[in-house]
């Protein structure tokens, strides 16, 4: 009876870790960083190896050139202010 209680307690403690594991796997898959290594396919001639080599080759060939598409805007120049007629308190 004690063993069954221990097993239920131990399995209950693993639930948060399983949830965390599943969440991390989903996030890594979305980012493209998750590579699952299954123990049954340990043969050296797997189809994953050539794909990885092709990805490496394309990563080396890709270059990013940053250019600016913005046009330079010239500031508007103000003309000279008109000289007042000499009458105080009046505006043009």
Swiss-Prot record:
Elicitor of plant defense. Induces the production of plant defensin (PDF1.2) and of H(2)O(2). Promotes resistance to the root fungal pathogen P.irregulare. Triggers the expression of several PROSCOOP genes (e.g. PROSCOOP2, PROSCOOP7, PROSCOOP8, PROSCOOP12 and PROSCOOP13). Belongs to the brassicaceae elicitor peptide family. The record marks 86 as: Required for ligand-receptor interaction. Residues 1-69 form a propeptide. Residues 35-92 are annotated as: Disordered. Interacts with its receptor PEPR1. Transmembrane segments: none annotated. Keywords: Plant defense. This is Precursor of elicitor peptide 1. GO terms for biological process: innate immune response; response to ethylene; response to jasmonic acid; response to wounding. Residues 49-64 have a biased composition (Basic and acidic residues). Induction: By wounding, methyl jasmonate (MeJA), ethylene. The expression of the peptide PEP1 precursor is induced by the mature peptide PEP1. It comes from the Eukaryota. Residues 37-48 have a biased composition (Polar residues). Pfam families: Pep1_7.
């Amino acid at each position: 009876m004690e063993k069954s209680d221990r097993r239920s307690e131990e399995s209950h403690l693993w639930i948060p870790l399983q949830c965390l594991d599943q969440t991390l796997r989903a996030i890594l898959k979305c980012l493209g960083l998750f590579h699952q290594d299954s123990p049954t396919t340990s043969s050296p001639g797997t189809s994953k190896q050539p794909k990885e080599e092709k990805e490496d080759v394309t990563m080396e060939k890709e270059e990013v050139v940053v250019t600016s598409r913005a046009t330079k805007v010239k500031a508007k120049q103000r003309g000279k202010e008109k000289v007042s007629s000499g009458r105080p308190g009046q505006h043009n």
